[in-house]
Amino acid sequence: MLRTKTPRPRGGKSRRATAAAGKEREREREREREGRSPSGELSLQLEHVSLFSFLADAPREGAAAARTPFTPFEELLEGSCDPDPTPPPPLPPLQPQATPMDADEVVEEKDSGILSQDFFCTPDYITPDAPQLGSGFDANKENIPCPNSPEKSVCRSKRYKRDCSPKGLGSNDIFDSQWIAPVQFEGLDDSEEEQLKESSSHKRGSYVSQSAVALRCRVMPPPCIRNPYLNTDHQIDDNVFGGRQCKSSGFSPSVDGDGLSRYRTDFHEIEQIGRGNFSVVFKVLKRIDGCLYAVKRSIRQLHNDRERRQAVKEVQALAALGCHENIVGYFTSWFENKQLFIQMELCDRCLSMDRNQPLKCGEALELLYQICKGLDFIHERGIAHLDVKPDNIYVRNGVYKLGDFGCATLIDRSLAIEDGDSRYMPPEMLNDKYEHLDKVDIFSLGAAIYELIRGTQLPDSGPQFTSLREGKIALLPGCPMQFQSLIKSMMDPDPVRRPSAKEVLRHPIFDKLHKAPAKK
């Protein structure tokens, strides 16, 4: 084909056309440098841009000026143009041929008209990463393979319940790590507590089975305390006690899960009914059974081991003795805030309240008989009270009961001995002679009855105090001589000559008092 040169237009319009054509050529060069082919975009450009408008103005402007050589793109356009000066009709828009295409090609053809997120450097959240359906998907349900039945496993696995999962954890967090409830390290030594905390902190990031948690973080129970008032050592294995000392960590505070104390939870405090040097007694109502009890609480906190052992002695003695009609009943005890609480039988009053009112001889005989039965009961079990006095003798429904076993010890002197009230102590106790501890209780009971009959408090020192230890006892007004001689024998300075509790019960003075009615 012969190439015809188009005359270059003159004037302002020709310069503007030349400038527009130059800009077009610059854009074509940039596309070529960027790797774009002009032939690929030719069909789209011809739909919107017509170059014949530039060629139509050329004959009306005059002779053509000297022009630059043709570019390959211009040569292509010149070759495709017809030499006829009449412009051809505009080309119709190109229609894509209906050729069979795959599904992937259809998707690419549709996406060609949509601006890609990659062009704007933004992530695509709409298009899925993986195909939703496999290429071999078949709508026929008969071709779907049936999965195999699960194999039976011998070991059982624990299933987690949704309602049991702790708040704040997702559904997948249960399988990543086991939630462990906070553990209270009560009953543990300081070294054991630190050891458990370190081991739990190392294992917190990994899964811990429930059995391992129970074994590792289990709160150790308090130690078993050997009761020295019981002769059952041959029936209990020594490994139960383990030789562990009675430490503060051994007595875990009796506090519920919600932080309430056992005393406030189980009992309603009514009033205070007694107070001593070491403890205070309250009249309480137990909430669960509606019965009245007496709760004895230590006044100050028991910090060291010696104080705790001394406080526990009363509990151990009461528990070892068991039930007797002339001994104050014992129910239970516990430690709370380093204080000892003892739940006991509630009595009407103690004899110290009647100290200002002299006791009649008949009442004194009944008192002597009943308390001697209680002393005989504890002496047969090898226990001495060592603190018999009116403050520790109680009355309930006309029955006299002996209480407060805080100074109780063993008659064989295998335990430490602590003196009671010095006003009722015999001379051998003041001289540290402990060969006849059971006779100490006999002297104290005689001195207590002597005080109650006279209606005056015994001295703790002075000439009268010495005279009583020497056996010089004044006459008791309104009492028979047989009764006065019995009281004098009970307060004999020599413990060997004093009668035992069993011998006092056999005294003839009680024959008339407790004589059985004759059978008809």
Swiss-Prot record:
EC number: 2.7.10.2
Catalytic residue list: D387
Origin superkingdom: Eukaryota
Disulphide bonds in the chain: none
Catalytic activity, as annotated: L-tyrosyl-[protein] + ATP = O-phospho-L-tyrosyl-[protein] + ADP + H(+)
Biased composition (Pro residues): 84-95
Keywords on record: ATP-binding, Kinase, Magnesium, Metal-binding, Nucleotide-binding, Phosphoprotein, Transferase, Tyrosine-protein kinase
Protein name stated in the entry: Wee1-like protein kinase
Gene designation per UniProt: WEE1
